[in-house]
Amino acid sequence: MSVMFDPDTAIYPFPTKPTPLSIDEKAYYREKIKRLLKERNAVMVAHYYTDPEIQQLAEETGGCISDSLEMARFGAKHPASTLLVAGVRFMGETAKILSPEKTILMPTLQAECSLDLGCPVDQFNAFCDAHPDRTVVVYANTSAVVKARADWVVTSSIAVELIDHLDSLGEKIIWAPDKHLGRYVQKQTGADILCWQGTCIVHDEFKTQALTRLQKQYPDAAILVHPESPQAIVDMADAVGSTSQLIAAAKTLPHQRLIVATDRGIFYKMQQAVPDKELLEAPTAGEGATCRSCAHCPWMAMNGLQAIAEALEQEESNYEVHVDERLRERALVPLNRMLDFAATLRG
């Protein structure tokens, strides 16, 4: 009988917050980064959850701001020889797996993810070994070694479609690491899913009591929820989806006021998509008094302007992502399956 690692008992130490920069310092680093990107034949790939000034810089320099699936597509297809990945470590690893010939830089190699940390490979391997009859599907928010154990990698934007497909083939599933997303997918598809018990430290902090109070304060608002949130929060939603799907929902919903239950980094692109709508942050536990993440990933916040400039300028060994070649080849198989499946959905 395997003993599952219990992420709920783990307390992940948060990184130190970057020192705030002055207006002049920000301007200095922005211009420096633009120059270094050209000199290095590099392009920025930034996640929706990075700080607004990072997303803005990616836009201005011809880079990409997107969810993890589109980040993977963009980086693999772009002709630049160097990718500067503004995100968390698994995103840099994924870029290297898909583009081994490219130099993959990150502002810091210490930018973690609680879902990744909550799925240690030794315990996960033992869990999979105890259920050899199940197809292993892992979320993109996992390490390269966990991906290498999987049959499929998936992002939240195509999770329901993929599991529905596997269920139609009669396959039973191991899902890891996010338990909330796994339960959401199970509810949507009816598939036989055995869930690992990881959580995102940001989404897990949204609580129904505080959200209900905000809903009563703004009864005309629609509620948009990422499926990494607890089921009780998902049940309150007018729209549920990945980051890109939530932005699309913001445009199609008729409501002029939107309560958004995901990392507040998404507000930069969402507000661009709906400039005339009011966006409200869904409250986290304690409404700011006792929350740990307070609706913003502390590791995403490590992607500051100074750190990006240093990654492009200094010794690459401190900022370059490496993945063992044999491991990369194994992890590439389920990643390519994901990309091929996503391509069929796009038509």
From Swiss-Prot:
Any GO MF annotation of the entry: quinolinate synthetase A activity
GO biological process, one term: 'de novo' NAD biosynthetic process from L-aspartate
Localization: Cytoplasm
Gene Ontology cellular component annotations, sorted alphabetically: cytosol
Chain sites annotated for binding iminosuccinate: 47, 68, 139-141, 156, 226-228, 243
Pathway(s) of this molecule: Cofactor biosynthesis; NAD(+) biosynthesis; quinolinate from iminoaspartate: step 1/1
Needed cofactors: [4Fe-4S] cluster
Name listed for the protein in its UniProt record: Quinolinate synthase
Organism: Escherichia fergusonii (strain ATCC 35469 / DSM 13698 / CCUG 18766 / IAM 14443 / JCM 21226 / LMG 7866 / NBRC 102419 / NCTC 12128 / CDC 0568-73)
